[in-house]
C-alpha cells in the first residue's frame, strides 16, 4: 500500500475550553488518542495537516502520529466540526496495530442513471464493515445504471472490498428504484387552474355574435 501520511503531534499541557479555543486560534486542533489499553493521550496537531488528511484520505484515515519522536499508528475515529464553517474543532483517534481488524462505517455513493422514468432513493449513506486497519476503503460505489422501477439493492447485494466483511444487517435496504410521485398543486393553484378551465369552457360554448 502507499506510504502512510505522517503528522507531528504535540502533547497538551493546558486543558479546558479556553485552552482549546487558544489552540484553534493558533492554527492547531486538539486531539485525544484512545485504544490498546493505554490511557488517553491529549495532543494537538497543525490544522492544515489534519484537514488535508481527511480531505485526501477520508473520514476513516489511518496515519502515523509522531509524539515526542515516537510514531504511533492511529486512525480517525470521530470528528467534531464547526456547524457554520465545517472546520474541524476536535478529533478522536484510535491507536491501532498493523494487521488488526476494525469495524468502520464506510460511506456509500451511487453512480449512473436508472431506466427512463425511474427515480433512485438511497436509504443509507454508510455500511458498517470489518476490515484490516490498513485496507479501509474510502467509499463504496454502487452502479445503478439502467435499473428498473421496483429493483432494489440490499446490503447483502453490495460487493465487498477486498478482505472486508459486512457487519450491517444483510437485509438493510440501500438503494430503491421507484416511480416518481406526481407533484401535487397547492389548493390555490388547483382552484385557479379549475377556474381557467371553466372560463375556457364557457367561451367555447358562447354563441358567436352575428356580423351585420
From Swiss-Prot:
The keyword Chloroplast does not apply. Signal peptide: none annotated. It holds the Pfam family Ribosomal_TL5_C. GO terms for cellular component: cytosolic large ribosomal subunit. Keywords: Ribonucleoprotein, Ribosomal protein, RNA-binding, rRNA-binding. One of its GO terms (molecular function) is structural constituent of ribosome. It comes from the Bacteria. InterPro entries: Rbsml_bL25/Gln-tRNA_synth_N, Ribosomal_bL25/Gln-tRNA_synth, Ribosomal_bL25_b-dom, Ribosomal_bL25_C, Ribosomal_bL25_long, Ribosomal_L25_dom, Ribosomal_uL5_bac-type. One of its GO terms (biological process) is translation. Residues 179-212 are annotated as: Disordered. This is one of the proteins that binds to the 5S RNA in the ribosome where it forms part of the central protuberance. Part of the 50S ribosomal subunit; part of the 5S rRNA/L5/L18/L25 subcomplex. Contacts the 5S rRNA. Binds to the 5S rRNA independently of L5 and L18. Belongs to the bacterial ribosomal protein bL25 family. CTC subfamily. This is Large ribosomal subunit protein bL25. It comes from Corynebacterium urealyticum (strain ATCC 43042 / DSM 7109). The gene is rplY.
Amino acid at each position: 500500500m502507499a506510504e502512510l501520511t505522517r503528522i507531528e503531534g504535540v502533547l497538551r499541557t493546558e486543558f479546558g475550553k479556553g485552552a482549546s479555543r487558544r489552540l484553534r486560534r493558533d492554527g492547531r486542533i486538539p486531539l485525544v488518542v484512545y485504544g490498546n489499553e493505554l490511557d488517553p493521550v491529549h495532543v494537538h496537531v497543525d490544522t492544515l495537516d489534519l484537514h488535508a488528511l481527511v480531505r485526501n484520505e477520508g473520514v476513516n484515515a489511518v496515519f502515523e502520529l509522531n509524539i515526542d519522536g515516537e510514531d504511533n499508528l492511529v486512525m480517525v475515529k470521530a470528528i467534531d466540526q464547526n456547524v457554520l464553517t465545517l472546520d474541524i474543532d476536535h478529533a478522536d483517534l484510535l491507536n491501532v496495530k498493523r494487521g488488526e481488524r476494525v469495524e468502520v462505517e464506510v460511506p456509500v455513493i451511487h453512480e449512473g442513471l436508472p431506466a427512463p422514468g425511474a427515480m433512485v432513493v438511497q436509504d443509507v449513506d454508510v455500511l458498517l464493515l470489518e476490515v484490516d486497519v490498513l485496507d479501509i476503503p474510502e467509499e463504496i460505489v454502487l452502479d445503478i445504471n439502467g435499473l428498473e422501477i421496483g429493483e432494489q439493492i440490499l446490503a447483502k447485494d453490495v460487493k465487498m472490498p477486498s478482505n472486508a466483511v459486512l457487519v450491517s444487517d444483510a437485509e438493510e435496504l440501500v438503494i430503491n428504484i421507484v416511480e416518481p410521485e406526481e407533484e401535487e398543486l397547492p389548493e390555490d393553484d388547483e382552484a385557479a387552474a379549475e377556474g381557467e378551465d371553466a372560463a375556457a369552457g364557457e367561451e367555447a360554448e358562447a354563441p358567436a355574435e352575428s356580423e351585420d
